């Protein structure tokens, strides 16, 4: 839902590329926003998985280094990136997951300069299994790995610096949405069917601020069938 008409988007590897890109196409918004990928792609449908970096039906392809000139411009309105760990200050680790560092790729350049950063992640990891029915989310098996932690292993994205720059930041999971505000990481939305205490707060190593205007995610997100009205929502807000 974090979109506006005519936005230029960047999608990173993982959930952003594999989910956000196809949803934009599925919802009929391909002509309303421009999707870019760090390899130099403009438009089209980004390919997922091991095919990250290529797309179908793109309208332009530029050199990799020229793409980063644009990103550092800054040219991106909204970037969608993955997140391995998040702390109470909104810092993100996306570069040191497990025993070996994975490297940053274009993550730092893009998240530093985009006007709005949306981190996309599952709430827990390692074994998480979810389903949805009738507009409600069901956690069939909880992940054993906590992702919202007191201390992240490596700072790939600095929430304090980003906030000082006036960047807009959201952290979106299947069951909860957070925003980095002046008071710290703030819970702003929760999925229908989710218990805030046992399925959110108890699975975090820190206690986030809870927005006094806490909302429920649109139940249409958790309904079978497509489209669910994203284009109409964007143009009416």
Stretches with model-predicted labels:
Residues 1-59:
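N-terminal active-site beta-alpha-beta segment that forms phosphate/nucleotide-binding
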Residues 24-27, 38, 207-211, 237:
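Short, structured coil/loop segments at alpha-helix boundaries
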């Amino acid at each position: 839902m974090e979109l506006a008409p005519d936005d230029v988007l960047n999608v990173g590897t993982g959930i952003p590329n594999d989910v956000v890109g196809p949803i934009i196409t599925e919802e009929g918004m391909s002509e309303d926003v421009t999707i870019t990928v760090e390899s130099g792609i403009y438009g089209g449908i980004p390919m997922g998985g091991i095919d990250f970096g290529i797309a179908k039906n793109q309208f332009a392809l530029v050199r990799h280094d020229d793409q980063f000139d644009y990103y550092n411009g800054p040219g991106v309105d909204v970037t969608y990136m993955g997140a391995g760990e998040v702390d109470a200050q909104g810092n993100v680790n996306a570069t040191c997951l497990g025993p070996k560092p994975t490297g940053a790729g274009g993550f730092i350049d893009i998240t530093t300069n985009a006007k709005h950063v949306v981190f996309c992640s599952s709430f827990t990891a390692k074994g998480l299994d979810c389903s949805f029915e009738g507009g409600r989310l069901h956690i069939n098996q909880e992940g054993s790995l906590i992702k919202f932690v007191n201390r992240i292993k490596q700072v790939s994205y600095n929430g304090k610096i980003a906030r000082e720059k006036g960047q807009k930041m959201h952290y979106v999971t299947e069951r909860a949405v957070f925003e980095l505000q002046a008071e710290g990481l703030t819970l702003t939305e929760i999925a229908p069917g989710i218990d805030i205490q046992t399925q959110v707060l108890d699975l975090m190593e820190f206690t986030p601020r809870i927005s006094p205007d806490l909302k429920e995610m649109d139940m249409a997100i958790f309904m079978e069938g497509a489209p669910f009205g994203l284009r109409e929502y964007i143009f009416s807000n």
